[in-house]
Amino acid sequence: MNQILLRVLAVVLSGVSPEPLDEKVVPFNEMPVECAAVYDADIRQFRQATATEVITSDLDGDKIPELLIFNGENGSGGVGWAVLQKANGKYRKVGDVFGILYKSGYGLIVESPCGWAEATWSYYTIEHGKLVCKFEITVKYSKPIRQEVVSIKIKVKNESGFTK
């Protein structure tokens, strides 16, 4: 985990985003029912959506890709994603994230911008069938779009919660 923490810190300090995950548009009728169900039904009806974005990525290092499915939620800080893991031939939702997603080997880096002067970077993995945030880095900037870092706050998750 230290290597990933250092990698995310390098991104934060350099202002250069890591490589985004590849999205693929998949029609709802071509995905398993449990996967299509994560897209908010009211939003789906309002938008008359017939498909959604899907990302495949190994989040736990078992060489079996999990599915990240756009759930219909979006805003200035990114979009909502449901994370599903395959077990016994079916997909099961293990968690949700909101933000901009990036590659990290295995695991998931999520950037959540908040206005022009702040952003939170989080690293997630799957443990015991649940999506777990292992650390968060909150950064305040003096200039917009990730320039001139003013402060960095790092919270690392341990057994009892986050520590500073």
Question: Which residue ranges define each predicted feature?
Answer:
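Mature extracytoplasmic domains of secretory-pathway proteins
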Residues: 64, 71-76, 86, 91
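Acidic, divalent-cation-chelating loop motifs in proteins
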Residues: 54-62
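Acidic, small-residue rich beta-repeat scaffolds with periodic aromatic anchors
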Residues: 3-10, 14-45, 103-164
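Residue-level detector of high-confidence beta-strand sites
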Residues: 70, 94-96, 134-136
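Extracellular C-terminal loop/segment signatures of secreted glycoproteins
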Residues: 81-103
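Short coil/loop residues immediately preceding or within conserved phosphate-binding loops
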Residues: 49-54, 78-79
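Structural motif
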Residues: 76-82, 117-122
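Acidic/hydrophobic-patterned starts of short beta strands in beta-sheet-rich repeat architectures
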Residues: 61-72, 105-112
